[in-house]
Amino acid sequence: MPFYFRKECPLNSGYLRKNRPEKPDGRRAVLRSQVLELHGISHGSAGARSIATMATRRGYQMGRWLAGRLMKELGLVSCQQPTHRYKRGGHEHVAIPNYLERQFAVTEPNQVWCGDVTYIWTGKRWAYLAVVLDLFARKPVGWAMSFSPDSRLTMKALEMAWETRGKPVGVMFQAIKAVIIRAGSSGSYCGDTGSGRV
């Protein structure tokens, strides 16, 4: 027959202190809400140091270590947008002459178009947007997006502008320096479409 013993002595006070439920800490709850709010305001880009600085400016005493612990408790992580770098081409592009000479006062539509390419972070990678503007209307007349900033992107935007404006003849297209366009491909396109000089 088994014999069971139960120890009838008081438990260690350290054991009791460790296992008792914690009292809700009002100050910590306020700081947690501040961390959550500030992380949201920064669209997830602020880290512990930035959050601590912003909270201190708001009047809440917080160091970066406390901010880091609160971020960890809330499951928040700083996500930084990567910096953009154009890849270097293998060869130098031919300089495109500037026929416009900063004469932006255009008297009629479809006389002068200008274009540029910019980059946009899409959440996973960089996308490139090429835009063609009519200098008379001061509005976009053609655009195109791509994941690679090559001459095809600029050509698509130029084709869209040419189609939407009724295939005009004699239009001068001036590319801003950031536009990635190769002289051979743009020249042949302008020759085919009659869009004028590049």
Swiss-Prot record:
GO biological process entries: DNA integration; DNA recombination; transposition
One Pfam short name: rve
Record field: transmembrane: none
GO molecular function: DNA binding
Keywords (A to Z) from UniProt: DNA recombination, DNA-binding, Transposable element, Transposition
SUPFAM superfamilies: Ribonuclease H-like
This protein's record includes keyword Isomerase: no
Domain Integrase catalytic, residue spans: 105-198
Function: Involved in the transposition of the insertion sequence IS911B.
Protein name: Putative transposase InsO for insertion sequence element IS911B
Protein source organism: Escherichia coli (strain K12)
